[in-house]
C-alpha cells in the first residue's frame, strides 16, 4: 500500500517521524489540508493523528496502486488549530 525507499525514508526521519507513524496518521481519519502540483506530480498534504496522540502533517502522492509519502512532520500551532476546526466543526479546506 505504501511506497518507501531511501529518499523518502530520509526525509521523514529528518523530522523525527517514523514511517509507521506517517502511515498511521494517514490511515487514522486524516484530513486533506491542501493540494498542489510539484514538477507535474499531484501532492496532497494531510493532517492526522497517530494512535499515540502525535499530530502530523503528511505530504503524499498516489503512484499507481501505492501511496508515496514525500515527507511528514509535526503540526505547528496554526496547523493544529486548523486540524481541530476542520475535524470537529466540519470546516475542511
Residue ranges and their predicted role:
Residues 1-93:
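Ribonuclease/tRNase effector modules and their secretory precursors
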Amino acid at each position: 500500500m505504501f511506497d518507501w525507499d531511501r529518499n523518502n525514508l530520509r526525509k521523514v526521519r529528518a523530522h523525527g517521524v517514523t514511517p509507521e507513524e506517517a502511515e498511521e496518521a494517514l490511515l487514522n481519519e486524516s484530513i486533506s489540508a491542501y493540494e498542489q502540483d510539484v514538477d507535474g506530480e499531484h501532492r496532497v498534504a494531510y493532517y492526522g493523528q497517530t494512535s499515540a496522540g502525535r499530530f502530523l502533517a503528511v505530504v503524499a502522492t498516489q503512484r499507481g496502486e501505492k501511496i508515496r509519502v514525500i515527507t511528514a512532520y509535526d503540526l505547528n500551532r496554526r496547523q493544529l488549530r486548523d486540524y481541530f476546526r476542520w475535524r470537529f466543526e466540519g470546516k475542511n479546506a
